[in-house]
A protein has these predicted regions:
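ABC family nucleotide-binding domain
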Residues: 16-230
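ABC-family P-loop ATPase nucleotide-binding domain
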Residues: 1-26, 237-253
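H-loop (His-switch) and adjacent beta-strand-loop-beta switch element
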Residues: 227-240
């Protein structure tokens, strides 16, 4: 069992990619108030692939959205890649996310008028990179994900699983230091899911990078460096490879 809190300083410890201390998030007020996160303590280390598992509605996606800066926490301390994100101005927060983070959410949001390769290259082109090498890198990533023959296809002609792989390639193309993924293998068969997880694992070979994955897919848990289980808006346990998972964790991933 791993302690749920860290005694290190998340701002000065280069090994901590993400540090959540007492993170709370609620929606609504009064009788409609819902406590989605109830004082979450969670860390993700650089050079590791961290998983969040637990029953539907337990707060996994909300926590991921807070870490990604899409939702503001209602309370607690959040440090991402050494930055106290809540202390940044709105503009600096956007620039920080654009430079350092990659996102894979269940809504792929592919641009319908662009090809698969062009969609993947968007982060590079938005940062001012030249078009030919950007497309070349995009095509190489798509090829690794089994879409080498579909790089010129429009999103409307792709299956849901193919669109998901395009979104994953887009999240990785600019080599972000932190990648957050919500159910990245949900629409994929086992072989495609393994290709995705291998690509994500490759991203953490460098010690300054980290990946956080929310999943219900127990088939991919063997890729994890750590597995944190959530229930009712809290982290209830964290395990490492070789630890035996509690039965409840195995049932509710």
């Amino acid at each position: 069992m791993i302690p749920l809190t860290s005694i290190t300083d998340p701002v000065t410890d280069p090994g901590l990619a993400v540090s959540c201390r007492g993170i709370r998030k609620h929606f609504g007020e009064g009788e409609t108030r819902v406590e989605a996160l109830r004082g979450v303590d969670f860390t993700a280390r650089a050079g590791e692939l961290s998983f969040l598992v637990g029953p539907s509605g337990c707060g996994k996606t909300t926590l991921l959205s807070v870490i990604a800066g899409i939702l503001d926490p209602s309370g607690g301390d959040l440090t991402v890649l050494g930055e106290r994100v809540d202390a940044l101005s709105a503009r600096d927060r956007i620039l920080f996310r654009r430079k350092n983070l990659g996102f894979v959410f269940q809504q792929y949001n592919l641009l319908p008028a662009l090809t698969a390769a062009e969609n993947v290259a968007v982060p590079l082109l938005a940062a001012g990179a030249r078009r030919p090498p950007s497309l070349e890198r995009a095509e190489a990533l798509l090829d690794r994900l089994g879409l080498g023959a579909r790089t010129g296809a429009l999103p409307a002609t792709l299956t849901g699983g193919q669109q998901q792989r395009v979104a994953i390639a887009r999240a990785l193309v600019h080599e972000p230091r932190l990648v957050v993924c919500d159910e990245p293998t949900a629409a994929l068969d086992h072989e495609s899911g393994e290709s995705v997880m291998e690509l994500l694992a490759d991203n953490v070979v460098r010690p300054d990078r980290a990946v956080i994955v929310v999943t219900h897919d127990s088939r991919v848990l063997h890729h994890a460096d750590s597995i944190a289980r959530m229930d009712d808006g809290r982290i209830v346990n964290t395990t490492r490879p070789g630890d035996s998972l509690p039965a409840a964790t195995q049932r509710s991933t």
